[in-house]
Amino acid sequence: MDSHTVSSFQVDCFLWHVRKQVADQDLGDAPFLDRLRRDQKSLKGRGSTLGLNIETATCVGKQIVERILKEESDEAFKMTMASALASRYLTDMTIEEMSRDWFMLMPKQKVAGPLCVRMDQAIMDKNIILKANFSVIFDRLENLTLLRAFTEEGAIVGEISPLPSLPGHTNEDVKNAIGVLIGGLEWNDNTVRVSETLQRFAWRSSNETGGPPFTPTQKRKMAGTIRSEV
């Protein structure tokens, strides 16, 4: 098991514990509490996958964070926070690509948490790229404005957008929705790749084909999810 995967999980568990204390003191707003609940489910799933106890991981995560804070000078901390807290807005799409109307021959829509996934299931044997406009904080995707799937010819064949009725979404929500979209498109023998910007800030890694690091099992599961909804 990758040690970075384990330490990341441990730190995430401790940070969730800190956020839970904030919520218990009635200091969190609705989106904060919504993300807290969603992240709790995500941590349980990751813990089960990794075979790690959440309580133990939280304790180790606390030690990691305390060590980092102890080693970091006040000046370095101020400089890090000044740069990290500056939210950036990144754009794969032009204004025209974002605002363009598009139509589906075989429309399919699925709600994936607080996000809506739409795609044209009539599209087959195409090379498709996913582009997105989103904000970034702490070098991680913070808020998705809009994601669209484009063919090489520039046609829009899929889309992911936030649901107005469910404000607030996490990085994991976005990745799950992208997985649903990719699974549905690949079911029809399309080849899907993700823009470099989206790979960098959603996954912080990618595979050699330009796609997110989904396993074959995950891809089959995602494709099956879309197929069962048809």
Swiss-Prot record:
Keyword Ubl conjugation found: yes
PABPN1-binding, as annotated region: 223-230
GO CC annotations, alphabetized: host cell cytoplasm; host cell nucleus
Post-translational modification: Upon interferon induction, ISGylated via host HERC5; this results in the impairment of NS1 interaction with RNA targets due to its inability to form homodimers and to interact with host EIF2AK2/PKR.
Key words, A-Z: Eukaryotic host gene expression shutoff by virus, Host cytoplasm, Host gene expression shutoff by virus, Host mRNA suppression by virus, Host nucleus, Host-virus interaction, Inhibition of host innate immune response by virus, Inhibition of host interferon signaling pathway by virus, Inhibition of host PKR by virus, Inhibition of host pre-mRNA processing by virus, Inhibition of host RIG-I by virus, Inhibition of host RLR pathway by virus, Interferon antiviral system evasion, RNA-binding, Ubl conjugation, Viral immunoevasion
Chain spans, region CPSF4-binding: 180-215
Organism domain of life: Viruses
Classification via InterPro entries: NS1, NS1A, NS1A_effect_dom-like_sf, uS15_NS1_RNA-bd_sf
Pfam family membership, one: Flu_NS1
Residue positions of motif Nuclear export signal: 137-146
Location of the region described as RNA-binding and homodimerization in the Swiss-Prot/TrEMBL record: 1-73
Biological processes, Gene Ontology terms: symbiont-mediated suppression of host cytoplasmic pattern recognition receptor signaling pathway via inhibition of RIG-I activity; symbiont-mediated suppression of host gene expression; symbiont-mediated suppression of host mRNA processing; symbiont-mediated suppression of host PKR/eIFalpha signaling; symbiont-mediated suppression of host type I interferon-mediated signaling pathway
Functional description taken from the UniProt entry: Inhibits post-transcriptional processing of cellular pre-mRNA, by binding and inhibiting two cellular proteins that are required for the 3'-end processing of cellular pre-mRNAs: the 30 kDa cleavage and polyadenylation specificity factor/CPSF4 and the poly(A)-binding protein 2/PABPN1. In turn, unprocessed 3' end pre-mRNAs accumulate in the host nucleus and are no longer exported to the cytoplasm. Cellular protein synthesis is thereby shut off very early after virus infection.
Note on domains (UniProt): The dsRNA-binding region is required for suppression of RNA silencing.
Protein name per its UniProtKB record: Non-structural protein 1
Species the sequence originates in: Influenza A virus (strain A/New Zealand:South Canterbury/35/2000 H1N1)
